[in-house]
A protein has these predicted regions:
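Amphipathic hydrophobic-ligand
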Residues: 46-50, 78-79
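A generic beta-sheet turn/junction motif
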Residues: 34-36, 45-46, 57-59
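Negatively charged, low-complexity tracts enriched in Asp/Glu with abundant Ser/Thr
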Residues: 1-40
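Intrinsically disordered, low-complexity regulatory segments enriched in Ser/Thr/Pro
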Residues: 51-76
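A conserved amphipathic terminal alpha-helix motif
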Residues: 72-98
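Short, low-complexity, polar/charged sequence segments that are solvent-exposed and flexible
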Residues: 22-25, 51, 59-62, 82-86
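Short flexible/disordered coil segments
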Residues: 30, 59-66, 89-98
């Protein structure tokens, strides 16, 4: 999975992602955070899954490429459904997913 944002400030992108989550139930389970040069998406409910995206700055903004994922056993059957919801949040925040 790859994500492209027109912004060049990763912290501003995290803020947009959090704002896009709003009051959804998903906001209680999903956390976006920057650690060094990585965007870390943490999903916590009946276990913890983490997705690590390496951040590269390009002339078009920030590009995030999935570099590592750890999916909790309880999350595996729901991976597709949760991924779709996270993609919608990313798109609502102004990002493009490929």
């Amino acid at each position: 999975m790859q994500i492209q944002f027109p912004d060049n400030d990763p912290q501003a992108i995290v803020k947009k992602l959090e704002d896009a989550m709003g009051g959804r139930a998903l906001a209680k389970m999903v956390n976006f955070d920057m650690s060094g040069n990585e965007l870390i998406v943490t999903i916590s409910k009946l276990g913890t899954s983490t997705l690590h995206f390496k951040c590269d700055h390009t002339p078009k903004g920030c590009h995030f490429a999935l570099s590592k994922e750890k999916i909790a056993l309880a999350h595996r059957p729901l991976k597709g459904e949760v991924t779709e919801k996270i993609v919608k949040v990313i798109q609502k925040a102004g990002g493009q997913v490929s």
